[in-house]
C-alpha cells in the first residue's frame, strides 16, 4: 500500500487530503482545501496563492483516483465548487441524513444535488427512517460531570434534541438514486479485490462543535 499526502498545510490553505494506492484501487480521501480564517495572520493574496497550489495538487490527484472518500462536509475536506473532481469516481461519503449538524446537512444536499451531471444517477429524497439517537455525551461521564461546564452541557443537550428532530423529520437523501456510484459510508466496510476499506461510525467532536465525522 502506498500513502501520499496530497496537500497538508495550515499556513494559508488548510487541507488534509491523502491519496492511498493499492493494487486494487486509488482512494483519494477528503479532496478539499479552504483559505485560512480571517484571523489567521497572513495576507489575503498569500492565502489565495496557497489555495491555488492546493487546488492544482488535488486536481492532479483526482485524475489518478478511482474512488473518493469524504469524511465530513467542511470545505477543507471537499470542494463542491469543482464537480469535475468527482466525475467517473465511486464515492464513499459521510451519511448526510443523520449524525450531522445543521450546516453540513444543508451543504451535503446542495453538493449531492449538483453531482448528478458529473457522477450520474438522480438526486432523490425520501421519508426519514425511524431511529433512536442516544446522546453521545452519555458515553463520556467525566466530561458530563464537570461543574464548570454545566451551562455548556445544558446548551448542548438542547441543540442535540433539535438535531434529532432534524434527522427524524427531515427528508433523507436516497443513495439508491445514484445507482451505486455514491454510498453512505458510516460504519460500513467495502471490499475491492484484496483491499478492504473500513469506515468507523461517526465520531463525536464535542459539545463545543456539535460535529461528526468518520475515518
Regions found by a protein language model. Give the residues of each.
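Pre-active-site segment of Zn-dependent metallo-hydrolases
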Residues: 24-70, 77-84, 89, 94-109, ...
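Conserved small/polar residues in nucleotide/adenosyl-binding loops
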Residues: 213-214
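Flexible, acidic/histidine-containing loops and adjacent segments that form or flank the divalent-metal
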Residues: 86-208
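Zn-dependent metallo-beta-lactamase
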Residues: 1-53, 155-205
Amino acid at each position: 500500500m502506498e500513502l501520499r499526502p496530497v496537500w497538508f498545510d495550515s499556513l494559508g490553505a488548510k487541507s488534509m487530503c491523502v491519496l492511498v494506492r493499492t493494487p486494487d484501487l486509488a482512494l483519494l480521501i477528503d479532496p478539499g482545501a479552504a483559505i485560512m480564517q480571517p484571523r489567521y495572520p497572513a495576507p489575503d493574496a498569500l492565502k489565495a496563492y496557497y489555495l491555488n497550489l492546493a487546488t492544482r495538487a488535488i486536481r492532479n490527484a483526482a485524475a489518478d483516483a478511482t474512488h473518493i472518500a469524504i469524511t465530513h462536509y467542511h470545505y477543507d475536506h471537499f470542494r463542491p465548487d469543482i464537480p469535475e473532481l468527482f466525475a467517473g469516481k465511486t464515492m464513499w461519503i459521510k451519511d448526510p441524513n443523520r449524525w450531522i449538524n445543521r450546516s453540513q446537512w444543508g451543504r451535503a444536499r446542495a453538493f449531492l444535488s449538483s453531482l448528478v451531471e458529473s457522477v450520474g444517477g438522480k438526486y432523490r429524497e425520501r421519508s426519514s427512517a425511524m431511529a433512536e439517537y442516544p446522546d453521545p455525551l452519555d458515553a463520556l461521564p467525566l466530561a458530563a460531570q464537570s461543574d464548570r461546564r454545566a451551562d455548556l452541557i445544558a446548551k448542548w443537550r438542547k441543540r442535540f434534541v433539535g438535531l434529532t428532530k432534524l434527522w427524524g423529520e427531515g427528508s433523507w437523501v436516497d443513495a439508491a438514486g445514484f445507482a451505486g456510484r455514491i454510498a453512505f459510508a458510516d460504519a460500513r466496510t467495502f471490499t475491492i479485490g484484496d483491499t478492504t476499506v473500513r469506515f468507523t461510525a461517526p465520531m463525536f467532536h464535542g459539545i463545543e462543535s456539535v460535529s461528526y465525522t468518520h475515518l
